Amino acid sequence: MGRPRILILGGTGEARLLAAALAMRGNGDVLLSLAGRTEKPAAQPVPVRVGGFGGAAALADFLKAGGYHLLIDATHPFAERISANAAFAAEASGIAAIALRRPEWQRLPGDCWYDVQSIPAAIEALGPSPRRVFLATGRQGAHHAEAAPQHFYLIRSVDPVEPPPALANVDYVIDRGPFTLEGEYALLKRHRIDAIIAKNSGGAATYAKIEAARLLGIEVMMVARAPASAVKTVETVEATLAAIDHLFPPAMKRGV
């Protein structure tokens, strides 16, 4: 085997860091695939393809046609469909697969979390009385707020929510993390937020809102992750690199 060919399914900070580390090593051919949902994606250190594959079978065909040896699923922890497609495609094409998943946030003393399984369940858990809600789940889940229009919603996303949800009492924040504790604290105070809906994405980039909620005594409707797939899972870029070294010894990666 020559240089290993690696396809990274990205869209996260971890994917970018992993791609940068592999590019610095220079001992494999790496392609980073982005779904294309973000209008202005961050610059990437390796060649990039943008857009979906058309399903699990089409992804398997792409892997086989491209002669890939490894598929790395470094998508968002809540990109369940993409992760399921990745697991199927790796098995169908007979190549190795690794899932890079940052650890979940853990409840700490002072946290007021209400565990839910979905964004609709979080909306329902707000109750019937009007509340002031920070909906911090991104633009794709924003339309669920239409089920409970009695609340005020502060909706934050990287790109504008299109079409906007049919809500009478809503404000929007267009911003990209990482966010600071000071900034999140001020945001929650300024909008008089008394409830947050958040996905348990893990990582440091968006954790500040959870810290600020703890300090302010704000309830958090925490959406749980779906069960992990059967793909080998690691939690850090370093662990991913170690797994790659195990799969492809140095002589193989040099093309020797």
Task: State each model region's role.
Residues 6-36:
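N-terminal basic/disordered segments at the start of proteins
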Residues 31-54, 111, 165-170:
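N-terminal beta-loop-helix "entrance" segment that forms/cooperates
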Residues 32-40, 100-106, 139-142, 157-163:
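Short, polar loop motifs at secondary-structure junctions
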Residues 46-63, 174-183:
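Glycine-rich, highly charged phosphate/nucleotide-binding loops
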Residues 59-120:
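Glycine/small-residue-rich loop that forms an oxyanion/phosphate-binding "nest" at active or ligand-binding sites
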Residues 146-177:
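Histidine/lysine/aspartate-rich catalytic loop segments that bind and position anionic ligands
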Residues 191, 200-212, 220-256:
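C-terminal functional extensions of proteins
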